[in-house]
Swiss-Prot record:
Entry remark concerning the domains of this protein: Consists of three domains: the N-terminal catalytic domain, the anticodon-binding domain and the C-terminal extension.
Enzymatic reactions: tRNA(Pro) + L-proline + ATP = L-prolyl-tRNA(Pro) + AMP + diphosphate
Superkingdom classification of source: Archaea
A Pfam family annotated for this UniProt entry: tRNA-synt_2b
The protein's name: Proline--tRNA ligase
UniProt main location, coarse: cytoplasm
Subunit and interaction comment: Homodimer.
């Protein structure tokens, strides 16, 4: 893909996903097709979360006094907060923030809900919009002023061990979710200077985009007891003593849809995994005047059969050339296309085309087996799209041992570089400036006899570095 940025902008419009012409910079309109993709993606995520969490909804406005309680947390984004200062024509006694993130709105309520160890754990999530006054160049779904799809989970636990277990649960939920969508990822522990403000540590998921930069697509934070102390979230133990809760939060945003588009799209346009496709199958009847009724009767029955068996299917009966229809539905990313013409009916066959590979096959038509055939092809598409995107992520991840290779590799190939690092903040920041990259985070690795690629000290971590969005 020669110009990913241009391609991405165009595909949002051409595939009818979003309209970025809303008269406020960094805010876009979800169009029906885009919103359906968003809905199906959220459905897949909520199905995973609902196994052990409950959905809630908190208000959008946060009192300035609550936001200010966690100074370290707020410092990370205080210049990006939108403020409500008037109610009608009256100045408000206290300014209200449009939710930049939800810790300071949720945790005051946790302090009211938690009294005893019997009230724990609390494990809730919500899907809301959040606001940040981005001053950098905005881009739909990637860098925005209104995040319209912020899914965030917040938990409170009696012990540090339970909180650590929740961190692992959050990571597993996201791994399963991204695997279902065929979105590749690398997981690392963010460096101290880039962790979530106020947290003990942050685990992050990053995807390599087609232009070689990485996009952060999800994070999981162990908050320790920092916010519990700030908002006085205490509980009484069985022995009558009191402790502060241990907390975890994790979240993802509109960027999931951006990564979905980027992971699977190509020069033809969008390519969607079946789980999120508004139409999993598009039926194109090949119509001539003399046999129109025969063909449409066949395709109507096929559409009804697939629909009755839980497959999202649509039939395109417009009076357009078949080639134009193929072009349009390929651009929209429909996973499977079925063509039926008079000759196919004579031969009792249908033609099945895969969007991901372009493979075309003639399939014998039997009402008793065709549903299984279609579901099998959709399953194959899901599997193969995941394999292809994971392969790209792997092939764009490079192990480097010499510092002079860093800039050369990043500038020529992009992607993620892994190398040995001492773990010291000064060294990490020096590396970012020297090589014009960002330190993504660290992974556990056997580093015996390894030295830091930047300063030459003994290495403590395998570090992931890249250019980022």
């Amino acid at each position: 893909m020669k110009n990913f940025s241009e391609w991405f902008h165009n595909i949002l419009e051409e595939a009818e996903l979003m309209d970025a012409r809303y008269p406020i910079k960094g805010m876009s309109v979800w169009l029906p097709r885009g919103f359906q993709i968003r809905k199906y993606a959220l459905n897949a995520l909520q199905e995973l979360l609902d196994k052990d969490h409950e959905e809630v909804l908190f208000p959008m406005l946060i009192p300035q006094s609550e936001l200010a309680k966690e100074a370290i947390h707020v410092k990370g984004f205080e210049e990006e907060v939108y403020w409500v200062t008037k109610g009608g024509k009256r100045d408000l006694n206290e300014h209200l923030a449009l939710r930049p993130t939800s810790e300071t709105s949720i945790y005051p309520m946790f302090s009211l809900w938690v009294r005893s160890h019997m009230d724990l754990p609390i494990k809730v999530y919500q899907t809301v919009n959040t606001f940040r006054y981005e001053t950098k160049h905005t881009r739909p779904l990637i860098r925005v002023r209104e995040i319209t799809t912020f899914n965030e989970t917040h938990t409170a636990h009696a012990t540090e061990e339970e909180a650590e277990k929740e961190v692992m649960e959050g990571i597993e939920i996201y791994k399963t979710f991204f695997d279902e969508l065929g979105i590749p990822y690398s997981i690392s522990k963010r460096p101290e200077w880039d962790k979530f403000p106020g947290s003990k540590y942050t685990m992050a998921f990053d995807m390599i985009m087609p232009d070689g930069k990485t996009l952060q697509i999800a994070t999981v934070h162990n908050l320790g007891t920092t916010f519990a102390h700030t908002f006085d979230i205490q509980f009484e133990n069985e022995d009558g003593t009191h402790d502060y809760v241990h907390q975890v939060c994790y979240g993802l945003s509109d960027r999931v849809i951006a990564s979905l588009i980027a992971a699977h799209g190509d020069e033809k346009g969008l390519s969607l995994p079946p789980v999120v496709a508004p139409e999993q199958v598009i039926i194109i009847p090949i119509i001539f005047k003399e046999n129109q009724d025969v063909v449409l009767n066949f395709t109507d029955n096929l559409e009804k059969l697939l629909k009755n068996n839980g497959i999202r299917v649509k039939q395109d009966k417009r009076e357009l050339r078949p080639g134009k229809k193929y072009y349009e539905w390929e651009k929209r990313g429909v996973p499977l296309r079925i063509e039926v013409g008079p000759r196919d009916i004579e031969n009792n066959t249908i033609v099945i085309n895969r969007r991901d590979t372009g493979d075309k096959e003639f399939v014998d038509y039997d009402e008793n087996t065709i549903v299984d055939v279609v579901k099998d092809r959709l399953d194959s598409i899901t599997h193969d799209m995941k394999e292809a995107s994971n392969k790209f992520q792997e092939e764009k991840t490079f192990a480097i041992e010499k510092p002079e290779q860093i800039k050369k590799t990043i500038n020529k190939k992009g992607g993620i570089i892994t190398c040995s690092w001492c773990g010291e903040t000064d060294c990490g920041k020096d590396m970012e400036e020297k090589f014009d990259i960002d330190v993504l985070g660290t992974q556990e690795s056997d580093l015996e006899n390894k030295t830091c690629i930047n300063c030459g000290k003994d290495a403590s971590y395998k570090v992931l570095i890249s250019k980022t969005y």
